[in-house]
Every structure is written in structure tokens, then in C-alpha cells.
């Protein structure tokens, strides 16, 4: 998770009025996004309240389980010998890799694991987002700190996650979490995950948090620690940075979008890299009017043009 701001009810209108003011053939209009019900931001309605996202999440976790099951049928080598079959390839990029030239950490002598983000990937922060929506206040680091240290009763598992992780553990695959929650609050995060049915977890073994490695919110240093111990056959998140920090390396929204479709990495989606929906916060919520709408894909409603 990378938390920046909560989507408010006007995010889809950002920059539109300014762009329209320069079009002399278009009458001035006021654009407003649907306000939601009783002021609930539409992104929160979608993520925390809709059946659509619940179905998407279950679909993603079902696909993850099927994928991991197929991988786990291979022989996991702990030494040489004639019974060793083809090594399953790690999906963690090596330290010298790029998106244009990806190279992956090797799996020799390592047992299988999957790595998941926590917030809005495995655990829904419904209670925290309720407080944000009800107060109308912007994101506040101190409030998030208080939430991390809460008892976790107002959070719950992402639909499909509990059954998937239970099935994956039964296959002999270790489940590891890599989160930007802080290491000083590790025991609270352990408790929240366990309460939601996503455990067992143990900080430093199957739970890695901000502060466990250099780099602050960057997850690659923690991924490197995990990949040194395990053959990471799948990763799950709600942000591109849950797969590699290279997606956050100064790329524009258009460049990030293009990077996901590049031949070198496109085949990983649903095949080692699994991404869930998050329209509420994160690196996806970026881009002005020009960045979001390509010039060759714009329509001017003739009903708004002047006679």
C-alpha cells in the first residue's frame, strides 16, 4: 500500500473546467462527479460496498490459488539428484533488472512462498475509511498511526483471501506479507491479520514492514530479503509498486500504463503478478486532464456547442 490521499467526490472533475474554458466552441459548463449516497465518496462505495469489487477480489484470489497449485506440483530442489525437475522461476526482479530488461532472482535451494501487500490487498481498512469519509478530513499520518495501533475490529479480510491463503498454505507454500505499515506497530498488525483469519504471521519471518530494511516506503529492499530466503512464485497487491518499485521510479501516468503492457512484463499479470482494485488511494490516482485523456480519444458533445 502507498497511501497518499482519499478520493473525494470531485476527483473525476479535476481539471475539466480549466480545460473547457479554453475551447471557444463549447459553452461554459459545470462538471461534477456523482456525490454518492449521504456524501460517501464514490471510490469508497465501489471498494468497500460494492458486489462488483467483492467479485473481482474473489476472482483474483481464485486465480492465484489455481496458479500456485500448479506451481507447487513441481519438485522443489534442496540439492542435486535425478529427481529434480525444472525450477519454477521467481517473480521477484533482481536488483539490476529493469522493466525493459527484466531478470529474476534464482530459486536454487529455496522453498516456495507468495508475497502479499496487506492494506486493501489482504485486509480492508473499512473502519479507517469510514472515519475519513465521515470527517471529510484529508489523510493525516497521526490518524493512520492511531489506526495501526487499534484492535483491528473495524477491519476485515478482502473477499476470497481467507480461503485462498488457507489453501495455499495447505500446499506447503509459505505466505508472507510485505506492508508499509510501520515495524514499531508490528504486534498490532500481526493481531489484525490473525483476527481477520489471514494468519498465522510473525514479524521478521512472514511479516515485513516499513523500517525492517533501508528505503522507507520502497518495498524492493524488503522483497530482496524475502527472495533471498524463498522462491517467491507469486506476488499480490493493489499498487504496481507491490510488484516492483521500478513502476514508481519517476514515470508519468502514461509511462506507467504503457509499462504494464510492455512485452517484457505483460505476461506476468495473472501469471505470477496479481493486482486487485483500489480506487480510493495510491499511486494510480495521478494525472491531469491531458495525462488521462489522450488527444486522439476525446469527444466533444455537439449538444454543448454554440450555434
For each of these PLM feature ranges, what is it?
Residues 2-12:
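Bacterial N-terminal signal peptides that target proteins for export
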Residues 10-22:
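Bacterial N-terminal signal peptides
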Residues 23-116, 288-307:
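Non-catalytic pre-domain segments flanking phosphatase-related domains
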Residues 26-31, 62, 186-307:
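C-terminal cap/substrate-recognition subdomain and adjoining C-terminal extension
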Residues 69, 73, 128, 166-174, ...:
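Sec-exported extracytoplasmic/periplasmic mature domains
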Residues 130-152, 254-257:
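A solvent-exposed, charged loop/short amphipathic helix patch at secondary-structure junctions
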Residues 148-176, 183-184:
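Short, acidic loop-to-helix structural element flanking the phosphoryl-transfer center
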Amino acid at each position: 500500500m502507498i497511501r497518499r490521499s482519499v478520493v473525494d467526490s470531485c476527483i473525476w472533475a479535476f481539471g475539466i473546467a480549466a480545460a473547457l474554458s479554453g475551447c471557444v466552441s463549447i459553452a461554459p459548463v459545470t462538471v461534477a462527479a456523482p456525490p454518492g449516497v449521504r456524501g460517501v465518496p464514490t471510490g469508497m462505495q465501489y471498494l468497500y460496498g460494492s458486489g462488483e469489487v467483492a467479485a473481482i477480489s474473489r476472482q483474483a484470489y481464485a486465480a492465484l490459488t489455481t496458479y500456485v497449485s500448479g506451481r507447487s506440483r513441481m519438485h522443489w530442489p534442496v540439492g542435486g539428484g535425478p529427481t529434480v525437475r525444472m525450477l519454477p522461476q521467481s517473480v521477484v526482479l533482481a536488483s539490476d533488472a529493469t522493466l525493459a530488461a527484466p531478470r529474476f532472482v534464482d530459486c536454487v535451494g529455496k522453498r516456495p512462498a507468495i508475497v502479499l501487500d496487506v492494506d486493501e490487498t489482504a485486509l480492508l481498512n473499512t473502519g479507517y475509511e469510514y472515519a475519513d469519509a465521515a470527517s471529510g478530513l484529508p489523510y493525516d499520518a497521526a490518524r493512520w498511526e492511531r489506526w495501526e495501533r487499534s484492535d483491528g475490529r473495524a477491519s476485515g479480510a478482502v473477499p476470497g483471501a481467507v480461503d485462498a491463503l488457507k489453501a495455499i498454505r495447505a500446499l506447503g507454500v509459505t505466505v508472507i506479507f510485505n506492508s508499509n505499515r510501520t515495524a514499531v506497530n508490528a504486534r498490532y498488525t500481526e493481531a489484525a491479520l490473525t483476527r481477520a483469519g489471514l494468519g498465522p504471521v510473525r514479524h521478521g519471518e512472514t511479516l515485513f514492514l516499513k523500517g525492517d530494511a533501508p528505503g522507507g516506503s520502497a518495498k524492493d529492499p524488503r522483497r530482496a530479503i524475502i527472495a533471498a530466503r524463498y522462491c517467491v512464485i507469486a506476488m499480490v497487491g493493489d499498487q504496481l509498486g507491490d510488484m516492483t518499485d521500478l513502476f514508481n521510479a519517476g514515470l508519468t501516468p502514461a509511462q506507467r500504463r504503457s509499462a504494464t503492457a510492455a512485452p517484457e512484463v505483460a505476461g506476468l499479470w495473472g501469471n505470477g503478478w496479481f493486482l486487485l482494485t483500489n480506487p480510493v488511494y495510491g499511486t494510480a490516482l495521478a494525472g491531469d486532464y491531458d495525462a488521462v485523456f489522450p488527444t486522439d480519444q476525446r469527444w466533444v458533445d455537439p449538444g454543448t456547442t454554440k450555434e
